[in-house]
Structure formats: C-alpha cells, structure tokens
C-alpha cells in the first residue's frame, strides 16, 4: 500500500534507507478559481470500528489518500445522519499540538445523537468509548471538488469519546446527546478519494449500504 519507504538488504538484516522528514511548502497558497472552497459538512458520514476493517488501501504516491475500505465478512458500520441540524458537526476541529513532545494534530468530531433510551445508551453512547481500537470516521463535506470532499478521521489512532465528551441537556440541541470523539494523528488531513468526486461518492454510498 504505502510505497514511499525504500528498503535494501544488508546480509541477514533488513535496514531502512535514510529518508529525511524535513519538507518545505511546495504549492501555491492561493484560491482555486475553477473549484472554490465550500466550507461545512453535509451531516452525513460513517463510523467504522477499526477491528471490523479487513483492508484499507492507500494511494501509492500520497498515502494521505485512502482509496478503498473493505469490512470483514458479516461486519456492519454505523451511519452518521446529522442532516437535520442547521449546522451539522459544529465544533469539529483539527488543531496542531505537541502534547507528547512531537508535532501532531488533535482532531475532534462532534455529533448529535438524535435518539434516546436504554437501547441508544447500550448500542451508541457507551460503545463510543469502549471499542478496543476506536473508530474510523468518513465525513461528507459540502465541497464537491473531489480530493478533500470526504474527510477521514481516525486512520492512525482510532477515534474514541473524550473523557468529558458525552453530554445532554434537555433544553439544548433538541434534547440530543452531544458526542465528542477525538484522536491524535501525525497527518493534518486524510482524504477518502478515488479518481474523481463521482467515483468517490459512489464508493461512499456503498459504505452507507453496509450499515446496521
């Protein structure tokens, strides 16, 4: 999958050829007039338990691009549908940090859970912090440019609910439970993308069909 690491054999040992992590900006910081940026999420997405994923395929030239996701046989994923919200996933952020002494990006996803009761507690809220490996989220954005239209969060370190990330106030957000899930990753943005927007949208819709 990831072809950017070179290896060479030395006797009985396998050693990695040196590759510097240093980099410099290599693209213009300018608006794309042909495809202007459109901010915001549609409110649709999927949440996949990492342990239920069979394979994740990455682009050979840029491993930040996830081209395909295959679930293990018989496994399902959870559809995120916050389309009813006037500003879905508000509060979702990506912010750089050096909490463990290395530059990483703290990513947070804020969902509204529009159901309640014992089943919602058992099947949605409590498992948000109980999954051993966490979750991978694919979130649909309003931007339809292609690369970047479907954000992937939790590829390196699975998303889990924050320690204080589960709240409910009956007089706010329509009584929905607010669920904040976070992870730390070394890459600013992973994108679910294959070929063009239409191809990727078809793949995203196929994931929706694998829901509970």
Go through the PLM ranges and name each one.
Residues 1-2:
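Intrinsically disordered, low-complexity terminal tails
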Residues 86-154:
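Structured, beta-strand-rich domain cores
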Residues 9-12, 18-108, 157-171:
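Solvent-exposed edge beta-strands and adjacent loop segments
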Residues 156-212:
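Mixed-charge, glycine-accented linear interaction segment located at domain edges/termini
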Residues 50-53, 114-118, 142-144, 158, ...:
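Generic structural motif
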């Amino acid at each position: 999958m990831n072809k950017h690491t070179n290896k060479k054999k030395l006797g009985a040992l396998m050693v990695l050829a040196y590759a510097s992590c240093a980099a410099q900006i290599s693209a213009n910081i300018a608006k794309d007039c042909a495809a202007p940026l459109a901010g915001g999420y549609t409110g649709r997405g999927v949440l996949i338990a990492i342990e239920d994923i069979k394979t994740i395929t990455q682009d050979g030239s840029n491993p930040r691009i996830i081209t395909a996701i295959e679930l293990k046989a018989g496994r399902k994923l959870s559809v995120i549908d916050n389309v009813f919200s006037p500003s879905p996933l508000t509060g979702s952020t990506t912010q750089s940090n050096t909490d463990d002494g290395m530059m990483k990006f703290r990513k947070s996803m804020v969902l509204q859970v529009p159901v309640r009761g014992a089943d919602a507690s058992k099947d949605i809220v409590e498992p948000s912090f109980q999954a051993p490996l966490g979750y991978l989220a694919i979130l649909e954005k309003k931007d339809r440019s292609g690369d970047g239209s479907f954000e992937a969060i939790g590829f390196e370190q699975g998303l889990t609910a924050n320690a204080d990330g589960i709240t409910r106030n009956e007089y706010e957000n329509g009584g929905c439970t607010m669920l904040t899930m976070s992870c730390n990753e070394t890459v600013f943005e992973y994108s679910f993308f294959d070929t063009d927007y239409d191809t990727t949208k078809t793949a995203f819709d196929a994931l929706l069909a694998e829901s509970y």
